[in-house]
């Protein structure tokens, strides 16, 4: 009986040793790793810029490249796909392009087959969620010259916007943060995800610059209120409780900050 126990024990020890041996940096200096990238303090800004860029760019290699290999670099740019699903499915716009996905969107007839804008919105929003989660796990170790609090708040806004988009378009996406990172993530009920996004936005708002006081194109307090206004406008759909008074208040704060409502 003892002999039978020795072999599993030896196998376990061997597996443990292999696992530790694999936890090393690649020897090839041309291979990018998190430790090598973030050794340069300037790369914290660049990584944040990359997170912002996912909304408007499909990848870093021009028209022929995409961050996600099975997504078309042209048809699945996040803002384009989001606009397509929000507008081409209404009487505001139709697109006569002959691609099958386009005809499906025109007629609101897509099903379980691949559809470029549907996959573009879902996969690229989840790409943002994953990127922000990794960024937030790394930034506490940034050098002192990095504005860690501000950068983290901007990244959290990008993730909140991605989750709002998923909430609105898909209902109950996988829920991943730096606290509950998992290969098999859980899903929050729609009303709980709404509450999480609202809380996240409220907690970062004061860290961000006042309206029109920050760098152009970066998150400020007004964009937080603008996103809250969008959420409150349809809160009854998401949670069963209307928030029209809160929507008006958020819109008034945006206007007071010097912006107009489109």
Task: Please place each PLM-identified region on the residue numbering.
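Bacterial Sec-dependent N-terminal signal peptides
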Residues: 1-27
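Short acidic-aromatic linear motifs embedded in glycine-rich loops, typified by GG[WY][YF]DAGD(H)
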Residues: 19-154, 158-169, 174-192, 261-262
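Sec-exported extracytoplasmic/periplasmic mature domains
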Residues: 53-57, 134-141, 168, 202-210, ...
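Short, surface-exposed recognition loops and adjoining beta-strand edges that mediate ligand/DNA contacts
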Residues: 61-87, 208-226, 236-262
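Structural signature of alpha-solenoid helical repeat junctions
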Residues: 144-151, 158, 193, 213, ...
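Short, charged, amphipathic alpha-helices and their helix-cap/turn boundaries
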Residues: 191-206
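Amphipathic alpha-helical repeat scaffolds of TPR domains
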Residues: 229-231
């Amino acid at each position: 009986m003892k002999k039978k126990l020795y072999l599993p024990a030896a196998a376990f020890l061997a597996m443990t040793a292999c696992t530790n041996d694999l936890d090393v940096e690649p020897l090839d200096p041309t291979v990018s790793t998190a430790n090598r990238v973030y050794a340069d303090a300037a790369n914290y800004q660049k990584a944040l810029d990359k997170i912002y860029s996912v909304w408007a760019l499909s990848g870093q290699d021009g028209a022929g490249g995409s961050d996600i290999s099975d997504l078309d670099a042209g048809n699945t740019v996040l803002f384009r796909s989001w606009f397509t699903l929000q507008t081409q499915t209404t009487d505001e716009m139709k697109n006569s392009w002959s691609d099958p996905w386009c005809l499906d969107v025109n007629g609101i007839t897509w099903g379980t087959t691949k559809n470029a804008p549907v996959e573009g919105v879902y996969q690229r929003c989840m790409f943002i969620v994953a990127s922000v989660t990794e960024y937030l796990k790394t930034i506490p170790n940034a050098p002192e010259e990095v504005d860690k609090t501000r950068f983290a708040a901007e990244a959290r806004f990008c993730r909140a916007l991605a989750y709002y988009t998923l909430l609105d378009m898909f209902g109950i996406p996988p829920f991943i943060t730096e606290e509950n990172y998992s290969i098999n993530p859980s899903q929050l009920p729609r009303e709980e995800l709404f509450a999480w996004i609202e809380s996240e936005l409220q907690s970062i708002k004061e860290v961000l610059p006042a309206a029109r006081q920050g760098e152009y194109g970066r998150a400020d307090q007004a964009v937080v209120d603008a996103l809250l206004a969008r959420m409150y406008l349809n809160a009854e759909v998401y949670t069963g409780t209307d928030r029209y008074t809160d929507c008006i208040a958020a819109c008034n704060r945006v206007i007071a900050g010097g912006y107009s409502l489109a």
